[in-house]
Amino acid sequence: MFPMVTEFMNYGQQTIRAARYIGQGFMITLSHANRLPVTIQYPYEKLITSERFRGRIHFEFDKCIACEVCVRVCPIDLPVVDWKLETDIRKKRLLNYSIDFGICIFCGNCVEYCPTNCLSMTEEYELSTYDRHELNYNQIALGRLPMSIIDDYTIRTIFNLPEIKP
């Protein structure tokens, strides 16, 4: 055939292909128009975390036997355990325990391998501060239980996100 006719046929095929792609994109856009928004208004609305959420670590001073298993299983050797050997009873006495949450990767190994269950993960995830040194928690700060989001009347809790159907 003539070169002009073949170029015109290619142009027609490309136009049809482009229109099909635009139509497919428009259909995807229309399918998303019926969904609820996923964004929540953070300080006023908060999600209820799942049962297995790994938040701030809670520490119970009385249960700790200063075995330092948490330090050995931590990938970054983060917990600082200070203890003194009591010679009369031949046992370790815990003096100080601290974790720097600015460095912690929240892997949960310390909680999982603790033989006395003195460590546990809480649902607290709001650890932001203006000074990074405030993220170094000692045994007193680690022993504080977090305030439950459900009990706070100023915050609207969202129990689950709307399910996205494909």
Swiss-Prot record:
It is found in: Plastid, Chloroplast thylakoid membrane. [4Fe-4S] cluster 1 binds at C64, C67, C70, C114. One of its GO terms (molecular function) is quinone binding. Its main location: plastid. One of its GO terms (cellular component) is chloroplast thylakoid membrane. SUPFAM superfamilies: 4Fe-4S ferredoxins. [4Fe-4S] cluster 2 binds at C74, C104, C107, C110. It is an enzyme of class 7 (translocase). Its EC number is 7.1.1.-. Residues 55-84, 95-124 form the 4Fe-4S ferredoxin-type domain. It catalyses: a plastoquinone + NADH + (n+1) H(+)(in) = a plastoquinol + NAD(+) + n H(+)(out); a plastoquinone + NADPH + (n+1) H(+)(in) = a plastoquinol + NADP(+) + n H(+)(out). Transmembrane segments: none annotated. Binds 2 [4Fe-4S] clusters per subunit. It is a peripheral membrane protein. GO terms for biological process: photosynthesis, light reaction. Its cofactor is [4Fe-4S] cluster. Keywords: 4Fe-4S, Chloroplast, Iron, Iron-sulfur, Membrane, Metal-binding, NAD, NADP, Plastid, Plastoquinone, Quinone, Repeat, Thylakoid, Translocase. PANTHER family: NAD(P)H-QUINONE OXIDOREDUCTASE SUBUNIT I, CHLOROPLASTIC. Belongs to the complex I 23 kDa subunit family. NDH is composed of at least 16 different subunits, 5 of which are encoded in the nucleus. NDH shuttles electrons from NAD(P)H:plastoquinone, via FMN and iron-sulfur (Fe-S) centers, to quinones in the photosynthetic chain and possibly in a chloroplast respiratory chain. The immediate electron acceptor for the enzyme in this species is believed to be plastoquinone. Couples the redox reaction to proton translocation, and thus conserves the redox energy in a proton gradient. This is NAD(P)H-quinone oxidoreductase subunit I, chloroplastic. It comes from Rensonia salvadorica. The gene is ndhI.
